[in-house]
Regions:
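ATP-grasp fold ATP-binding core
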Residues: 8-15
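Helix-start/capping segments and mature chain N-termini
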Residues: 2-3, 16, 21-210
Length: 210
């Protein structure tokens, strides 16, 4: 970042097994490859922040593997296939379901829903990523909501929720106004949380949130 002159940006760290031969077996003394990728920060889309974004459901299901659930690994072919389902800019992200039609996460985001000022997020047990901002929101949720729960959320139940927002470590938090045919309002609690995190990240560059 310093060499590129990036004062405010994103640092992505990728770790692979390392260079080896063919096949799945690898030598114990193999040296992992660590790749550092730096990018300038994107300008915050103020319109999306104020008026919200639209999401859609993906047809391609998320893969289930309880041993890897929560980890952001490189074997994300399910997310790649799901993201290929649309080209238009109308949708910010796609929501992925497991084989029992439980909502898990987006192709690049974690998901939160609220009802009566109680916050809910899909539980990460068999699939999905426990993202950095997901955990930060869970840890700070009671500043704005009465309670926060990690639960199983079925696709058929989304009409019962008042609002929705998405998170990841780059966008932080964005409110959602539409998920397919379901319309959400942006509640005061969600708006207060968004303002809190953006003000705090400007002061500390996110370090105190992690």
């Amino acid at each position: 970042c310093l060499r590129k002159g990036i004062k405010n940006g994103v640092l992505k760290i990728v770790i692979t097994r390392g260079i080896g031969g063919r096949g799945y077996k690898f030598e114990k003394e193999i040296v992992p490859t660590v790749i550092f990728l730096s990018f300038p920060s994107r300008e915050i889309n103020k319109k999306a922040l104020n008026t919200g974004v639209k999401l859609r459901f993906c047809e391609f299901p998320i893969f289930e593997n309880s041993m890897l659930a929560g980890l952001k690994h490189l074997n994300r072919i399910d997310s790649v296939m799901a993201r290929s389902e649309w080209e238009e800019d109308e949708f910010f992200d796609g929501v992925m379901l497991d084989n029992s039609e439980s909502i898990i996460d987006g192709t690049m985001t974690n998901l939160f829903f609220s009802k009566n000022k109680v916050l809910y997020t899909p539980i990460i047990k068999k699939s999905g990523i426990n993202g950095i901002m997901r955990q930060v929101v869970i840890d700070n949720a009671k500043l704005f909501f009465k309670e926060v729960y990690e639960i199983e959320i079925k696709k058929k139940t989304i009409s019962t929720y008042d609002d929705m927002f998405v998170t990841n470590s780059v966008i932080k938090i964005l409110p959602v106004t539409h998920l397919s045919n379901k319309k959400f309002k942006i509640t005061n609690a969600t708006r207060e949380m968004i303002n809190f995190f953006f003000k705090k990240s400007k002061r500390s560059k996110n370090l105190e949130l992690i």
